Amino acid sequence: MIKSCYIHIPFCKKICSYCDFCKNYYNELVVDNYLDNLKKEISKNYKNEVLDTLYIGGGTPSSLSKNNLNKLIYILKTFKLNQDYEYTFECNYEDINEELLDLLKNNKVNRISIGIQTFNDKFSKVLNRDINKKEMIEKINLTKKYFSNINIDLMYALPGESINDLKMDLEIIKKLDVTHISTYALIIEDHTNLKLQNIKETEDDIQNKMYYLIVDYLKNNGYNHYELSNFAKENYESRHNLTYWNNDNYYGFGAGASGFIDNIRYDNTKSVFKYNYGKTGVYEEKLSLNELMKDEVMLSLRKINGINKDVFYKKYNILL
């Protein structure tokens, strides 16, 4: 049974130097056409299941114009949601204002994820991000007036970042008291601007020190370390991301989206051009029983609680 859905909105006003996700510079006509094709893909494949989680990611979904944001919201009303649902919308802090928050709240969104990465403006140039600590804090506090469930993305092991730099970010996060933190070490992927600039990743021993600093700091300040990279206040774990780590079925719609349905993993094209011409899928793989069990184990080991032996037996009729 499918209880989760991911929607990819691959448009940004500015491309971060580290980003390896499917993304394109914002163009109103291209976005308008993209949303038309997104609606077609959903209409063709969604079977009216009642969903527990819906996640709108990118790219930068909040970068859409008012008209296209309303168009997206209308398309998303296609999905039926459980009474106890989780509906996440990713935002760039610069896009956040009362009008946006009001629109999202009035259309069933109940969780906001803000891609902060760092509050330290000395990394603006190398990350190709506009970093304004004062505005970031103001926008997060504004979001808290509308939503009780907020995630912040924190990136560490940035080029030239010190332990003290990271501590400063963590101290700000502590004061903001949001419900969820996702943390990621910077990985310099091929075909990114950082790779082209020949920037090197932070040494492993420093990365490890930073990781354990984050773990200890957040655990000591009321966060449950429930997955390798994720921390949550009690009862605020990301139910959508747990869908992935529990190896459960989920839809993936939009260019660059992936899904897992009836033992088949699939990836959509990363080309918005191809997607807008109706050429959505590029890859499908039907997994064998052994492959399914292997994935179950590997994904479960990302969770701090590890493998649920009862669930594994129920799925595969095999005792661990």
Language model regions located:
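Local cysteine-cluster metal-coordination motifs and their immediate loop/turn environment
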Residues: P10-K23
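C-terminal scaffold of the Radical SAM
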Residues: I2, N24-K44, D52-I318
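Immediate flanking context of iron-sulfur cluster ligation sites
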Residues: M1-I9
